[in-house]
């Protein structure tokens, strides 16, 4: 048996495996892809953290709080032992004139295929992380990912050079004009795509208030179904909870709309393992602080009753 959250996710995985289009991609890994799909999660029925594999709430929450703070440097994430953005910063470093270690060209694929190289890669990555944590000037130069999510959410710059805080503005709009159809935040800034380590995959979200409940719809242009989407579901569910609390509302639905929803070819066996599992009851979320959303810390968040099957490892496509 599956709970409603795991069931919706499993159905999408099964559909992509059954009818997905086989396509090449930027990473040259290969994918099975479906264009256009929507999932709906009733947040009043629990917190949608998948249970058919263990998903780290800490990684999800600290990344979201990093976005909310407007931060774009992995130093904050590494302080919480959050490594999900490391590869993109590391890639910039090993391509620079300041790097004098072993050749790290195409490190993502080589680490998977060559055990000896993988040990070198892990050693160089470990050194890089310590430099980021302990040397602020190094972190400023090589830990920053460019104008990624947090920058666009909190400090969008228009062509005249004016700065605009989208997240703060949308919260004020929800409070003062709840029926507005303009409760929108966009991370997709076409003029700054080239200055981002990775163009935003989850590109735009909109809020909707009805009967004292706040719902959120995300449009995700590119969705790594196995590794990314379980994080994205929980991240935007958490964002909905935080903004609902900020605006004295209850939570409604999280609606997840996909553009290119894909399973990488080297994730298929991992997906099949997950699909063979039954689920547990979903956990619940408790926010143990009345602080502003902009001052919330990870320690203020409590996930209650999360039981899951073991995690399933799979390579990330860089």
Curated annotation (Swiss-Prot):
Q: Which PROSITE patterns match?
A: THYMIDYLATE_SYNTHASE
Q: In which pathway does it act?
A: Pyrimidine metabolism; dTTP biosynthesis
Q: EC annotation?
A: 2.1.1.45
Where in the cell? Answer: Cytoplasm
| CDD domains the UniProt entry points to | TS_Pyrimidine_HMase
Quickly give the catalysed reaction: dUMP + (6R)-5,10-methylene-5,6,7,8-tetrahydrofolate = 7,8-dihydrofolate + dTMP
The record ties this protein, via InterPro entries, to: Thymidate_synth/dCMP_Mease, Thymidate_synth/dCMP_Mease_dom, Thymidate_synth/dCMP_Mease_sf, Thymidylate_synthase, Thymidylate_synthase_AS
Keywords, alphabetical: Cytoplasm, Methyltransferase, Nucleotide biosynthesis, Transferase
Q: What does this protein do?
A: Catalyzes the reductive methylation of 2'-deoxyuridine-5'-monophosphate (dUMP) to 2'-deoxythymidine-5'-monophosphate (dTMP) while utilizing 5,10-methylenetetrahydrofolate (mTHF) as the methyl donor and reductant in the reaction, yielding dihydrofolate (DHF) as a by-product. This enzymatic reaction provides an intracellular de novo source of dTMP, an essential precursor for DNA biosynthesis.
Please give the name of this protein. Thymidylate synthase
Species the sequence originates in = Staphylococcus haemolyticus (strain JCSC1435)
